[in-house]
């Protein structure tokens, strides 16, 4: 794996943390996968890449990829698999996610269903980034 070469070089150059994600610019669905994606359909679908980076560093790692379930996210943080959870579509679906989790209102969360209809679809159609849950 090239990670064994590049991660230590980046640490030596002064990198203090890693935000691990995936991008395939020939396929937007691989970069922002819908729930029915053949390889990336599960909660935390990119965390396996964090595990690979972890093999080469003890620096903090931010994970991303279909994170929406508060219990799942907490487990990843508590076990040290990741030091930070990054969310994009989930925060479009419910910008109050962090506040609802902190207040113990997890049942009130609008969970991202990863349909990509208004977030990615709106972006591709130059209509802005929105969510199917938005009112109005």
Model-predicted segments: where are they?
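Flavin-dependent oxidoreductase catalytic cores
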Residues: 1-136
């Amino acid at each position: 794996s090239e990670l064994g070469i590049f991660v230590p070089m980046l640490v030596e150059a002064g990198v203090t943390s890693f935000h691990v994600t995936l991008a395939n610019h020939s396929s937007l669905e691989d970069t922002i996968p819908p729930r029915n994606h053949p390889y990336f359909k599960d909660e935390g679908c990119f965390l396996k890449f964090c595990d690979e980076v972890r093999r080469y560093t003890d620096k903090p790692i931010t994970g991303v990829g279909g994170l929406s379930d508060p219990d799942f996210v907490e487990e990843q943080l508590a076990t040290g698999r990741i030091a930070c959870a990054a969310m994009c579509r989930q925060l479009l679906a419910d910008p109050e996610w962090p506040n609802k989790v902190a207040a113990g209102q997890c049942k009130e969360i609008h969970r991202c269903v990863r349909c990509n209809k208004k977030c990615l679809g709106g972006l591709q159609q130059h209509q802005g980034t929105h969510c199917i849950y938005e009112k109005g």
